[in-house]
């Protein structure tokens, strides 16, 4: 099958879910608009903020590109884990553990540098401006605390899902971040530090940032958020495409299935 035929087939596979996502965004905008109008009629002070639509031309491009990233991703369940180039970000909670000593803040490294031959590596991809990702960070922290005796954990900070100067989302909660598009590696690392200031992670969790060529994002087909588990340099678990298929409960189930309760408590 030629490349043109493959591209056409992938496009036809993407179209139904793409249109369903567009419908969801339209419904979301309708609900928010009705809520906004109701607050205006009630003369509530909470209506002073700007109303932002989600169904925009830039939003459609982002959604479409996210499906393309997922379709063309290199990572496959049971196959070799891509050893993407990343940049180390210091975790304020980390002490002088072995990983921190080997990798200085801002130093270039590779994703599999954090993998152990005997322990699985849980890799969590996301950014501060992705609400589904930030909402799950407390659950991710709990996973690290409960399973760090049997597994290693890595957070990979990627390109912003909803930068304030791009496809921004309404800032209506304490989880909201105002982060612009990353112009350079320093911007990306600064955004990662901003996330860690709001959501502290246990010292057992290492943090890195994707390079500006987004090689980790492309290899793992992340787009918005994704989680996977690497074991013996193979993909032992591959989570679905975020936001709708991003599921940390599946990670917990995998860890519980593969490790006894006694080992976890140890």
From Swiss-Prot:
Post-translational changes noted in the entry: Ubiquitinated by MARCHF6, leading to its degradation by the proteasome. Deubiquitinated by USP20 and USP33.
Alphabetical list of PROSITE patterns matching this protein: T4_DEIODINASE (PS01205)
First-listed, main subcellular location of the protein, grouped into a coarse class: endoplasmic reticulum
Known catalytic reactions: 3,3',5-triiodo-L-thyronine + iodide + A + H(+) = L-thyroxine + AH2; 3,3'-diiodo-L-thyronine + iodide + A + H(+) = 3,3',5'-triiodo-L-thyronine + AH2; 3'-iodo-L-thyronine + iodide + A + H(+) = 3',5'-diiodo-L-thyronine + AH2; 3,3'-diiodothyronamine + iodide + A + H(+) = 3,3',5'-triiodothyronamine + AH2
Lumenal-facing ranges: 1-9
Annotated tissue distribution: Expressed in mammary gland and in brain.
Keyword tags: Endoplasmic reticulum, Membrane, Oxidoreductase, Selenocysteine, Thyroid hormones biosynthesis, Transmembrane, Transmembrane helix, Ubl conjugation
Ranges in the topological domain labelled Cytoplasmic: 35-266
Molecular function GO labels: thyroxine 5'-deiodinase activity
Family affiliation: Belongs to the iodothyronine deiodinase family.
Function: Plays a crucial role in the metabolism of thyroid hormones (TH) and has specific roles in TH activation and inactivation by deiodination. Catalyzes the deiodination of L-thyroxine (T4) to 3,5,3'-triiodothyronine (T3) and 3,3',5'-triiodothyronine (rT3) to 3,3'-diiodothyronine (3,3'-T2) via outer-ring deiodination (ORD). Catalyzes the deiodination of 3',5'-diiodothyronine (3',5'-T2) to 3'-monoiodothyronine (3'-T1) via ORD. Catalyzes the phenolic ring deiodinations of 3,3',5'-triiodothyronamine and 3',5'- diiodothyronamine.
Protein name, entry field: Type II iodothyronine deiodinase
Originating species: Mus musculus
Gene that specifies this protein: Dio2
């Amino acid at each position: 099958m030629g490349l043109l035929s493959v591209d056409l087939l992938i496009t036809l596979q993407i179209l139904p879910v793409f249109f369903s996502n567009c419908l969801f965004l339209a419904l979301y905008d309708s609900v928010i608009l009705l809520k906004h109008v109701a607050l205006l009629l009630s003369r509530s002070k909470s209506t002073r903020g700007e109303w932002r639509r989600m169904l925009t031309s830039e939003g459609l491009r982002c959604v479409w590109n996210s499906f393309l990233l997922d379709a063309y991703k290199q990572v496959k369940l049971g196959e070799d884990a891509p050893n993407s180039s990343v940049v180390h970000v210091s975790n304020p909670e980390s002490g002088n553990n072995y990983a921190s000593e080997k990798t200085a803040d801002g130093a270039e490294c590779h994703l599999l540098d954090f993998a152990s031959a005997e322990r699985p590596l849980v890799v969590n991809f996301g950014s501060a401006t992705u609400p589904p990702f930030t909402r799950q960070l407390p659950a991710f922290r709990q996973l690290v605390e409960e399973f760090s005796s049997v597994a290693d954990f890595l957070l990979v900070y990627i390109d912003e899902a909803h930068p304030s100067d791009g496809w921004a989302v309404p800032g209506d909660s304490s989880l909201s971040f105002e982060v612009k598009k990353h112009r350079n590696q320093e911007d990306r690392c600064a955004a990662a530090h901003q996330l860690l200031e709001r959501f502290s992670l246990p010292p057992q969790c290492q943090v890195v940032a994707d390079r500006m060529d987004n090689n980790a994002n492309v290899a793992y087909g992340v787009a918005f958020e994704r989680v996977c588990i690497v074991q013996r340099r193979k993909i032992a678990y591959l989570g679905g495409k975020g936001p709708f298929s991003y599921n940390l409960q599946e990670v917990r189930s995998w860890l519980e299935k593969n490790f006894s309760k006694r080992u976890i408590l140890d």
